[in-house]
Design a protein with these regions (language model features):
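Single conserved hydrophobic/aromatic residue that forms the stacking wall/gate
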Residues: 1-14
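Select subsegments of transmembrane alpha-helices in polytopic membrane proteins
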Residues: 43, 87-92, 119-126, 190-201
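Active-site and channel-lining beta-strand-loop segments
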Residues: 55-87, 175-184
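Membrane-water interface of transmembrane alpha-helices
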Residues: 57-58, 95-106, 161-176
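Alpha-helical transmembrane segments
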Residues: 78-93, 146-162
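Ordered, amphipathic secondary-structure segments that act as subunit-interaction surfaces
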Residues: 100-149
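Terminal transmembrane helical module of multi-pass membrane proteins
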Residues: 173-240
Length: 242
């Protein structure tokens, strides 16, 4: 009995040691990711903050309350203080940029994401921040900018870029169609993402077309299709044993 207890204790210690080593290795790999993309992360975070500089230069020309959200036909339906629009929004986007990077670098399957997708993830927020914030500031100082055209166009291009990459995307917990059936079957993941790639590209084209039409139902239908079609297809594959 004594030998059995000692053996059990040694087994538990061995498992704990392996778990600790695994956690240490994962933390080490995440730290290496931070170091590898440090320059890109610093650059993209600064770009996320750059609209703040532009806003401060235009500070005296902008009203105290600024339209920061627009509905169809460029009709403002959301307002923020000048301080929030110029300082708060860029700061929030910069914080979101750092959080997104940390979440991506901490993915247990980070090695499957690939450098191209990581760079795409790191550049989404800064580019969006720069274009959208500058469009908001332009409207605030009386320069007419079609926010609906700009936002639909950006989203459309983003969908096309993501759709182009999806078929090459390997299993991970950060990007792609992350449902139980894709995460537990490599074949299910591969087939789902081949279909999802085309769906997202077509959805991107639809959004670019909608930048001219600016119809809400096209926006909602496109987003619903991008989410539901790949998930539904993945579930059907699962029911077939794939």
């Amino acid at each position: 009995i004594s030998c059995s207890l000692v053996g059990s204790e040694m087994c538990i210690r061995d498992r704990s040691w392996k778990k600790s080593c695994s956690g240490f290795q994962s933390s080490k790999e995440a730290l290496l990711m931070w170091k590898k993309y440090k320059t890109t992360l610093i650059l993209t975070t600064l770009i996320s903050l750059f609209p703040m500089v532009i806003g401060l230069l235009l500070w005296n020309r902008m009203p105290d309350t600024i339209a920061t959200h627009f509905g169809t036909n460029n009709v403002p339906n959301g307002w923020s203080s000048k301080t929030m629009a110029v300082i708060g929004i860029p700061l929030l986007l910069a914080a979101l940029q750092i959080f997104t990077a940390g979440f991506t670098f901490s993915d247990p399957k980070r090695q499957n994401i690939g450098p191209k997708m990581i760079r795409l993830v790191l550049w989404i927020i800064p580019v969006t921040s720069l274009i959208i914030c500058c469009s908001i500031y332009a409207n605030a100082v009386g320069i007419a900018v079609d926010i609906g055209f700009v936002s639909n166009g950006i989203v459309g291009l983003l969908f096309i870029l993501i759709g182009n990459y999806m078929p090459k995307c390997k299993q991970n917990y950060t990007t792609g169609i992350k449902v139980p059936w894709t995460l537990h079957s490599q074949e299910n993941w591969n087939r789902t993402h081949r279909l999802a790639g085309w769906v997202w590209i077509i959805g991107g084209v639809a959004m670019i077309v909608n930048s001219f039409l600016q119809l809400e139902w096209i926006l909602f239908l496109t987003i619903a299709a991008l989410v539901l079609i790949p998930i539904g297809y993945s579930f059907l594959l699962f029911k077939k044993g794939i």
